Every structure is written in C-alpha cells, then in structure tokens.
C-alpha cells in the first residue's frame, strides 16, 4: 500500500470511527440505483448521496454508466444500508430527495465512489459536510492514480459545481 493510500485509509477510518456512534444511522433497503449518485429505497423514498456528484446518464456524459454500475455494486438491490444525515447540510434537495451519506458495513459509499473515480466531491454552495476531508483525500488519490473517470474522460470539476465529463 502506498503512503497516499495509507493516508486516505487512515483519514476515512478516523472520520468514520469518530462519527458512527453519534451519527444517528437509519436502516433502509435499496430497491435500485437510479444513477451514480441516487438510490431508490423500499420505503418509496429516494436518496441523493450527499456531497458527491456523478456523471449524468440522461446527458450522455462520459463514465455515467460505469458510475451507476459502481453504485449498484456497492449498494445492490435488496441490500440493507445505513443512512446518515449531516446536520450541517439540508435534509432534502429541491426534488424532495433525502440528502444522506450511505453506509454499507464499515464503508462510506459516498467516499468510496469518489475514491474509485466514479464520482467527485460536490460541496453545494461551498458548504462542506462531515466527510469533506475524506472526500477531498479520496478525489486527490483518484486523480493522481487516474482511477475511473479521471483516466477515461476529460473531466471538468470544481468542488462547488457539478461534475461534467466527456470522452477523451
């Protein structure tokens, strides 16, 4: 494991360990992934993975299908997940979707998607949430290693704007 990988792992684990008990995690069951940053739940609710953005399927963006596939692998249909609300951030987006971090076991799916290069951090209106440091460390490593969209696409990204991708 490289020094950068070890640092990212340490930051992620430290953040997770320090927040898990007070996070108020709520169980939910996944029905399907709508795209690379949205899940439909058995309760009928829809979750927008907060603080991340994945390429848009409907806009034909580069890596959109693979981002969806990454989320489907991390949180497949029928999987029990834990949802975490960040009190620093809005509860719902303008479409009425829950804004949540999604956890599967000891994995923060939001951070994992960024680490894999399937999504980028997205700090709406510049507001950084509970896992901002982990998300920024994950994107730095994904970019450096050309993981996911960083190796496959031309990526236009700024931390407080949605990601835009196109083929190389």
Spell out what each predicted region is.
Residues 2-168:
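Small beta-barrel nucleic-acid-binding modules, primarily SNase/OB-fold domains
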């Amino acid at each position: 494991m490289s020094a950068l990988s070890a640092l990212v792992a340490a930051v992620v684990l430290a953040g997770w360990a320090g927040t898990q008990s007070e996070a108020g995690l709520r169980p939910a069951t996944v029905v399907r992934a709508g795209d690379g940053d949205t899940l439909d739940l058995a309760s009928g609710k829809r979750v927008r993975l907060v603080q991340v953005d994945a390429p848009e399927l409907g806009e034909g963006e580069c890596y959109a299908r693979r981002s969806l596939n990454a989320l489907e692998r991390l949180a497949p249909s029928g999987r029990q997940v834990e949802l975490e609300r960040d009190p620093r951030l809005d509860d719902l987006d303008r479409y009425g979707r829950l804004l949540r971090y999604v956890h599967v076991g000891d994995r923060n799916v939001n951070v994992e998607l960024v680490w894999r290069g399937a999504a980028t951090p997205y700090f709406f209106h510049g507001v950084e949430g509970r896992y901002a440091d982990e998300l920024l460390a994950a994107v730095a490593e994904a970019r450096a290693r050309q993981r996911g969209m960083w190796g496959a696409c031309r990526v236009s990204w700024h931390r407080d704007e949605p990601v835009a991708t196109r083929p190389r």
